[in-house]
Amino acid sequence: MNILVYRWNSYNYIDIIATFQSMGHQVDVIEQELESYDEDEVFAARLHGILQQKNYDFVFTVNYFAVISGVCQQMGIKYVSWSCDSPLLSMYHKNVFLDCNYFFLFDKTNYLEFKGMGVKHIWHLHIWLISLQRKICGEESSG
């Protein structure tokens, strides 16, 4: 798979990217400070251009960015976001209802709330599963 990762100042991207790559996936990374999580015309244009250049299977982020969701919807590309914050205020945006979105939330209350509001592709994913996997496999974090 070809995966585009939007990387911002979050602690867990090194492990996520390494995991995707260890599974045989091609990972490209885009980094840019956003004016707003909801709207940023300059970033949206840049992302649109990148998505036109290569056939990506999905865009991945830690936490949710409505601006990315909007571009993915326009381009017909899946947007996968994994939330490790609670409450994730950026999810209280109309774009959460777009069909391109695939949410993985660690907070069960938030999961139930958004599922109840009609968000289509949403799952509850415990953060401790990653820690448990490392303990079982004897792996240490790479960063």
Residue ranges and their predicted role:
Residues 81-143:
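Catalytic core of nucleotide-activated saccharide and alditol-phosphate transferases
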Residues 42-56, 79-83, 98-106:
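Short, structured secondary-structure boundary patches
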Residues 26, 78, 120:
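Residue-level detector of anion-binding/catalytic polar loops
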Residues 68-82, 88-89:
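Well-ordered mid-protein domain cores that form the structural environment of catalytic cofactors
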Residues 1-75:
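N-terminal pre-catalytic "stem/leader" segment of glycosyltransferase-like enzymes
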